[in-house]
Every structure is written in C-alpha cells, then in structure tokens.
A protein has these predicted regions:
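Membrane-helix/interface signature in polytopic inner-membrane proteins
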Residues: 220-234, 276-316
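Single transmembrane alpha-helix segments in multi-pass membrane proteins
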Residues: 55-120, 142-154, 169, 282, ...
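Membrane-interfacial amphipathic/re-entrant helices at transmembrane-helix boundaries
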Residues: 21-84, 120-126
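Transmembrane alpha-helical segments in multi-pass inner-membrane proteins
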Residues: 97, 316-329, 333-396
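Transmembrane helix-bundle core of multi-pass membrane transporters
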Residues: 164-282, 339
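Inter-helical junctions in multi-pass inner-membrane proteins, predominant
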Residues: 63-74, 169, 173, 255-268, ...
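Alpha-helical transmembrane segments within multi-pass membrane transporters and channels
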Residues: 121-162, 372-373, 377
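Transmembrane alpha-helical segments of polytopic membrane transport and secretion proteins
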Residues: 1-45, 218-249, 410-415
Length: 415
C-alpha cells in the first residue's frame, strides 16, 4: 500500500501539490532559492497578480464603480454558476478530458426544475434532489462512453451538448416557464441573516468572512507542515506567507464590501463550501492524487494499480452533478427557465480553467486557479460592460486572453 501511494505521488506532475521543482538545494543562497522558485511557479503567482491588476484597472477606469458593494454582490451572483461548474471542469481537464456539454446540461436541468416546480407543483426540495440525480445520471452515461467504450470525450460531450440543448427545447416546448417558488429563489437571491448591525454594516457577514479567512490560513499552514514532515519541498516561507496573507486580505475586504450591502449571498456560502471541499479533495486525498496521476501519465497510472477507467467515469459523474447544481442556481437567479439558458456557458467554464493555470495536456491545475480564472473572466465582463464596450469586442478580448493564457502554458512547458 505504501509503495502504491508513493508511486501515485510520483506520477503527479505539478497538479494539486504545487511543490517546487528540484532547481534549488538547501545550501543555495536564500535569494537564489526565491528566484528559482518564482521562475518555476510563475503561473501560480501570475494568476493572483493578474486578477489584482485587472481589478485595479477597472476600478480606476470606472471611477470606483467596480468595487461598489452593490456591484461586488452582482459579480458574485453573476459568476456563481460558472465557478461551480469550473470546479468540476478542472477535474475533467486534469484527468486529460474535456466536457463540452455542461452548458446544455445546465439549461436542461433548469428546464426540468421549472416543469417540476411550476407545472407539476412538486415540492422544491424533492425537485432539487431529482435534478441533481438527473445530472449524475447524465454524467454517468457520458462517462461510460468515455471511460469504458473509449469514445473520445470531445465527441461524446459534443453529442451531449446537442442532445440536451434539444431536450431543453422539448421540455419547455419553446417557451419560458416561471416563476419559481419563493423558497427556491432564495438559493440565488437570498442572503444570510444578520444578527448584528453596526452603522449599516452586516456584522454577521463580515465576521463570517473573517473566520473563513482565518480557517484558510490555518489549513494552508497545516498542509505545509504536513508536506514538510514527509520530506517534500515547499515554497519559501516568506512567499508562502505573502501569498496566503494576500488571499486572506482579499477575502476580508470582499466580505466587508458585501456586508456593506446586504451581506453574504446564500449562493456564496454554497460556492465557498464547494471550493473548500474540492481544494481538500485535490490536495489531501488519495482520489485527488490519482486524478492528477491519470492526467499526467495514463499508462503509468494504470500500471501503478489505479483503476483509470473507473476514475474517469466518476470524474464525469461529478461534473454532471455540478452542472445540474449550476443549472438550479442560474434558474433561481432568473426566476424562470428559458430555452436559451446555458448557451455558451461551457466556453466560459473551460476558459476559466485554462486561464487559471490548468494544462491542456492534463495533469496540472488547482482549484484556487480555476476560481481565480472564473473571476478574471467575470471582472472583465463586468468592467467592460460598465465602460460600455460592445459585446462583440468583449468576445474578441476574452478570446485573446484565453489564447495568451494557453500560449504561455505551452511556451513554459517547451522551454
């Protein structure tokens, strides 16, 4: 068992671990070690710096509108379903596959939810469970063709995109269906209750954000200590501290902005919980290491004893569930299901993962990177809309950003 775990760990090529390459030695000067580490991990630090730079740019060009509490709340609500799907898409890409059907599945599940709750008056809790199980079944069907029948994921999910786009039209009969029950709408339109109010600031939301930041810092520190105890190389202490303090500061600052409006949205709590769950799964569980091993070198992973077919199958089941959840969140936000819901979502989700550092060849990517990538896309969309940039040029700019991100990844890999 220990040898197998060691073999799995050795197959992970820069995925969830974030370990530095062996370009330095303990005897190397501190400055040289820092420079070498930054050179080999520029992707990780570049993502955070890029997000901060983009936010600063649009904050000043929009005369401060971008970081107004109302607009920050809208940013969270507008990008929540993209972030949710990006978590699943990251695992699919890391495993060496792609899923083009997530947008159509998202729209189909929203349509199914509308028919169940509005037309058949099914209790919203039961309807949500049915929709999530439907997403799992869709992922299982596509996963079987990909993992066991060996049909390329591009073809299977392209077919799925067409099938579920058509099924959404059929279920809705070409019309919009709504409104949803008020309880269901709270998924996207509700905010956590506030037990304290101080000069217009929802103190409960702010304190919760501060607690989340503190928990993140402690978790990262414990993870670092655990890796060091196993003799694995880690990033220099000052870089580790600076990066995580920056993340914590951003969380606290955004919590303050949200608390200055209506508080933390319910969907942000769902999204944050999923982020923590998937970050833990990819960094500290056996199945997480095996997914990175599968994407890094499928043949070697199979020889090491990993059941690669079953792992790929469950990766798509997971993607189906998250696409269904995103469909419910999006439908609740619109308060109606439309035949065009989910159109083009898969492009934003895939772009978020690649911009966030996932490798097109598989085996590389981080949860926090996918989330940052999603918010880079969201901030760009929001900022350009505030500035009055047309949708045509918005698409051009987003395409260029995606191409640049993938080019940098390929360039660094070929150096």
């Amino acid at each position: 068992m220990e040898r197998r775990a060691a073999a799995e760990q050795s197959l992970v090529e820069g995925g969830g671990s974030g370990a530095a390459t062996s370009g330095t030695t303990p005897a190397a000067p501190v400055q040289t070690r820092y420079i070498e580490y930054l050179k080999h991990n520029m992707r990780e630090y570049g993502m955070l710096l890029s997000l901060l730079a983009i936010m600063a740019f649009f904050h000043f060009t929009t005369d401060g509108t971008l970081l107004q509490p109302l607009n920050v709340t809208n940013l969270v609500l507008q990008n929540s379903y993209i972030v949710i799907m990006a978590l699943g898409m990251l695992l699919v890409i890391v495993a060496g596959h792609i899923d083009l059907s997530v947008g159509s599945v998202c729209g189909f599940v929203g349509a199914l939810a509308a028919v169940l709750m509005v037309q058949y008056e099914v209790n919203f809790v039961l309807a949500v469970i049915i929709c999530l199980l439907t997403g799992a079944a869709i992922g299982a069907i596509q996963g079987w063709f990909i993992a066991f029948a060996k049909v390329p994921s591009f073809i299977v999910t392209l077919a799925g995109m067409l099938i579920f786009k058509g099924l959404a039209l059929a279920v809705l009969q070409g019309q919009s269906v709504g409104p949803f029950p008020s309880e269901f709408q709270l998924i996207s339109s509700g905010f956590i209750p506030d037990f304290f109010a101080v000069d217009g600031v929802r103190l409960t939301s702010f304190l919760l954000g501060a607690v989340i930041a503190a928990v993140m810092l402690v978790s990262r520190l414990r993870s670092r200590q655990s890796r060091i105890s196993y003799g694995m190389e880690e990033e220099p202490w000052l870089l580790f501290l600076a990066k995580n303090l920056a993340f914590a500061t951003i969380i606290v600052f955004l919590s303050y902005l949200l608390a200055s409006y209506k508080g933390l949205p319910n969907v942000l709590i769902v999204m944050g919980g999923l982020m923590l769950l998937y970050d833990f799964a990819t960094n500290r569980t056996t199945i997480g290491r095996r997914i990175y091993a599968l994407g890094g070198n499928p043949k070697a992973a199979k020889l090491s004893g990993i059941k690669t077919e079953r792992l790929a199958f469950y990766t798509f089941v997971n993607m189906g569930v998250l696409a269904a959840l995103a469909g419910l969140v999006f439908a609740a936000r619109l308060n109606t299901a439309t035949p065009k819901a989910g159109l083009g979502f898969e492009l934003d989700v895939i772009a978020a993962c690649f911009i966030g550092g996932a490798s097109a060849s598989g085996g590389v990517g981080k949860v926090i990177g996918a989330v940052i990538g999603a918010f880079i896309m969201g901030v760009m969309n929001n900022g350009m809309s505030i500035l009055g940039v047309g949708i045509d040029y918005q698409q051009v700019i987003k395409g260029l950003v995606l191409l640049a991100a993938v080019y940098i990844d390929v360039y660094n890999k070929n150096k």
